[in-house]
Amino acid sequence: MTTANQPICPSPAKWPSPAKLNLFLYITGQRADGYHQLQTLFQFLDYGDQLTIEPRDDNQIRLLTPIAGVENEQNLIVRAAKMLQKHPGNTPVPRGADISIDKCLPMGGGLGGGSSNAATVLVALNLLWQCGLTDEQLADLGLTLGADVPVFVRGHAAFAEGIGEKLQPAEPVEKWYLVIHPGVNIPTPIIFSDPELKRNTPIRPLAALLSTPYANDCEPIARKRFREVEQALSWLLEYAPSRLTGTGACVFAEFDTESSARQVLSIAPEWLHGFVARGVNVSPLHRVRSGKKLKAVSADNDLQRYVRSK
């Protein structure tokens, strides 16, 4: 069992909230409650949102940077903080926080932004409030917020089954990726409710999955229903192996070197917005928690400008 780390507060209280990619994603069934069962391989990126979290000596949870179109009380950031605040294992002392977010990841992009935000709040406030919960306990809390939250809490690349909550640590090759947002957001229910979605891919052992070309069962639906996704993938596939992440809308191409990825980004059409990042098997959030410094990532890129303009 993972034990809770000693409090280490990044200065000045800034916490990474990294993106993830689904390197492959197969839908193997659907439960009676409507949730889809899957097999997927998660890997983090050294790129994402950034949260600034300042503890308060009262019970107020304040999100200082509201996200357009999302009520604060429904935001996973606030919900995660309040859930931890009310955890029965916590001592009854005033705990609050002021939280702001530098939003770089698009909503409805398949990069896990909301789930990552929730996980960062749980991990950071567990330390700042000195709750002493283990990663397993935090992951269990996170699962009630979303199926992808536990992998961000645990902080290691993983092979996932079930609805995404059954995690097995994995070590995929840490390649470079060009991630493209095609200018459309895709709510997950649109893909999962499509009657043509393939829901019966045979369950296979991890070794078999790793030895065959990767694919995403959601990709045909996204390409069919969203012209922008079809166009983005068609363009990317001219340069490198490419596919959808999650339920979209972002697509990605893999490269062996950063320079190769940046060269393709430099010739992308104006209607595509993207960034280059390294795939990493240890989450930047957990590297910060353990006191390690992160490699500086460009504070400004095309996708950040696009997201901030919305």
From Swiss-Prot:
Any one GO BP annotation for this protein: terpenoid biosynthetic process
MF (Gene Ontology): 4-(cytidine 5'-diphospho)-2-C-methyl-D-erythritol kinase activity; ATP binding
Stated name of the protein: 4-diphosphocytidyl-2-C-methyl-D-erythritol kinase
The gene coding this protein: ispE
Species this protein is from: Yersinia pseudotuberculosis serotype O:3 (strain YPIII)
Entry annotated with the keyword Membrane: no
Family indicated by similarity: Belongs to the GHMP kinase family. IspE subfamily.
Binding site for ATP: 106-116
Source organism phylogeny: Bacteria, Pseudomonadati, Pseudomonadota, Gammaproteobacteria, Enterobacterales
Record text on subunit structure and interactions: Homodimer.
Reactions accelerated catalytically: 4-CDP-2-C-methyl-D-erythritol + ATP = 4-CDP-2-C-methyl-D-erythritol 2-phosphate + ADP + H(+)
Enzyme Commission identifier(s): 2.7.1.148
HAMAP family, sorted: IspE
Main function: Catalyzes the phosphorylation of the position 2 hydroxy group of 4-diphosphocytidyl-2C-methyl-D-erythritol.
InterPro entries listed in its UniProt record: GHMP_kinase_C_dom, GHMP_kinase_C_sf, GHMP_kinase_N_dom, IspE, Ribosomal_Su5_D2-typ_SF, Ribsml_uS5_D2-typ_fold_subgr
Pathway: Isoprenoid biosynthesis; isopentenyl diphosphate biosynthesis via DXP pathway; isopentenyl diphosphate from 1-deoxy-D-xylulose 5-phosphate: step 3/6
Keywords carried by this UniProt record: ATP-binding, Isoprene biosynthesis, Kinase, Nucleotide-binding, Transferase
